[in-house]
C-alpha cells in the first residue's frame, strides 16, 4: 500500500492488538507524513480547543455574550503540513485525499452515536468549481452518513474576511424547506478558526428546534 500524500510504499505491520481485535491498520499515511501533523494537546480552551490555553478563550467569551454556547471538538492543529494538505485537497481538487484522515475521523465521530450529522454546505458556484464538498468527502471516507439540511447562498469567500466582517454580513446559510430538524445534531466543518461560520449555523439550527447542537472539525 502506498502513502496517499507522498506515494511511498508502506510496510504492513500486524500488531498483537490488531490481531486480537481482528482488524487491520488502515492508515493511509506513512510514518514520515504522519509525523508532520500535530494533534491538539491537553492545554486548550475547554469550549473550542484553541491551543496553549487552559481557560475559556476570548472568542468563546464573545460568543457567549452573543448567546452561543460553544461546544466544539477538533483533532489537529492548522500547521504547515495541514495547510499543504488542504491546498492539495480543496484547491487542487485531489479528491482521493479525502481518505487521508479517515481512521482518525472514524475514531472521533463514533463517539457521537446519539447525534445526527450535518455538514457545512458549499454555495452552488463553489461546488461547481470544486466538484465536491470537502467536508462531505471527509465524513463519507470515515464511513458515516449525514443529513442534507442546509443550503448556502453565493457570497464572498469567508477566508477573505476578518471576524467582524464575517459577523457583520447576513448569514448565507439557510435550512431547506420541508426538512425535519433532529433534536441532537453534530455540525461538522473542515477547519475552525474564529468559529464565525459554524457557530452562527449552530444558532440557526437551535432556533429551528434542535435541542443539543455540538460542533466538530478536523482542524482547529
From Swiss-Prot:
<keyword id="KW-0178">Competence</keyword>
<comment type="function">
    <text>Involved in transformation (genetic competence for DNA uptake).</text>
</comment>
<dbReference type="Pfam" id="PF00156">
    <property type="entry name" value="Pribosyltran"/>
</dbReference>
<dbReference type="InterPro" id="IPR051910">
    <property type="entry name" value="ComF/GntX_DNA_util-trans"/>
</dbReference>
<protein>
    <recommendedName>
        <fullName>Competence protein ComFC</fullName>
    </recommendedName>
</protein>
<comment type="subunit">
    <text>Monomer and dimer in solution. Interacts with ComFA and DprA; ComFA-ComFC form rings about 150 Angstroms in diameter with apparent 6-fold symmetry.</text>
</comment>
<dbReference type="InterPro" id="IPR000836">
    <property type="entry name" value="PRibTrfase_dom"/>
</dbReference>
<comment type="similarity">
    <text>Belongs to the ComF/GntX family.</text>
</comment>
<dbReference type="InterPro" id="IPR029057">
    <property type="entry name" value="PRTase-like"/>
</dbReference>
Amino acid at each position: 500500500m502506498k502513502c496517499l500524500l507522498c506515494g511511498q510504499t508502506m510496510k504492513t505491520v500486524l500488531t498483537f492488538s490488531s490481531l486480537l481485535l481482528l482488524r487491520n491498520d488502515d492508515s493511509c499515511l506513512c510514518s514520515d507524513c504522519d509525523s508532520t501533523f500535530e494533534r491538539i494537546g491537553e492545554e486548550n480552551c475547554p469550549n473550542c480547543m484553541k491551543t496553549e490555553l487552559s481557560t475559556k478563550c476570548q472568542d468563546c467569551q464573545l460568543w457567549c455574550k452573543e448567546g452561543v454556547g460553544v461546544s466544539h471538538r477538533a483533532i489537529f492543529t492548522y500547521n504547515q503540513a495541514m495547510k499543504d494538505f488542504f491546498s492539495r485537497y480543496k484547491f487542487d481538487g485531489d479528491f482521493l485525499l479525502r481518505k487521508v484522515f479517515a481512521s482518525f475521523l472514524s475514531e472521533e465521530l463514533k463517539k457521537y452515536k446519539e447525534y445526527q450529522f450535518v455538514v457545512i454546505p458549499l454555495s452552488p458556484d463553489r461546488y461547481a468549481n470544486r466538484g465536491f464538498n470537502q467536508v462531505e468527502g471527509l465524513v463519507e471516507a470515515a464511513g458515516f452518513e449525514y443529513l442534507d439540511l442546509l443550503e448556502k447562498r453565493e457570497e464572498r469567500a469567508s477566508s477573505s474576511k476578518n471576524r467582524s466582517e464575517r459577523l457583520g454580513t447576513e448569514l448565507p446559510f439557510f435550512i431547506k424547506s420541508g426538512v425535519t430538524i433532529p433534536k441532537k445534531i453534530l455540525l461538522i466543518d473542515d477547519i475552525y478558526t474564529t468559529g464565525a461560520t459554524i457557530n452562527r449555523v449552530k444558532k440557526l439550527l437551535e432556533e429551528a428546534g434542535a435541542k443539543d447542537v455540538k460542533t466538530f472539525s478536523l482542524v482547529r
